[in-house]
């Protein structure tokens, strides 16, 4: 998917994230994002009971994915915007994509990582939990992003130029060095120096997810989302055993640590660009997966989305750009 299309998807994400500065309780039946942005119901696009076979409903969403990566988003306090931009595009040197002005006072910020994006959304309104106390092991949810770079000196120079303290790297015993820093909004970023890696983490992004029940979460990402489960790995820096699940350039790292004193399901989330959001919606309903935001259209962006939650409330957001293709047929074995 080209940068223009990805930009539109980013615009929709932040349009949702930048809803109303002062959130109000929506009227009954109105569809909103966690931040309160209003969307149009797309229930007319939903598959009817009996329209899909049990095999279609119980298969994963893997064959709906388009493009070589997923996207992630990061919500943060609005007053941290300038520092966040300096951190992600200066210290980390992620590619700055064209921002989109949503209103006179609200702007969408996009950074590129390979074919995907880290989307920066100012504002933490809504009914989501924002609690990164305890860092990587403090509670459930997305607790860190993992970015890779080829050269340590270049990273150190960029941090200094951007006005941030120099990170301290430690050897990992596998030819890499790593450090853990926090962005200006208090979210951990693991930086890995890996010989041969693309600069600006253009090999993609890693997403660390602390799970309350590792087996249940692994099943969700394996059998529903349909990510490629890989062999467990040890992260020496974090002191964790990680269970990787891949989607092209994007890797989710599941783990279980701590006593879940500080669950967080609002600071970050995952977006999958797909060919048929209503089909993802149907599969979710068949398995009683929690729906964060029902099937909807976002006016002005030609976007059909459904926001689902993993077992710990992590946002797994399915976004379809453009009209839905011909409905899946029972005979297709989708």
Model regions: which residues?
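N-terminal secretory signal peptides that target proteins for export/translocation
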Residues: 1-2
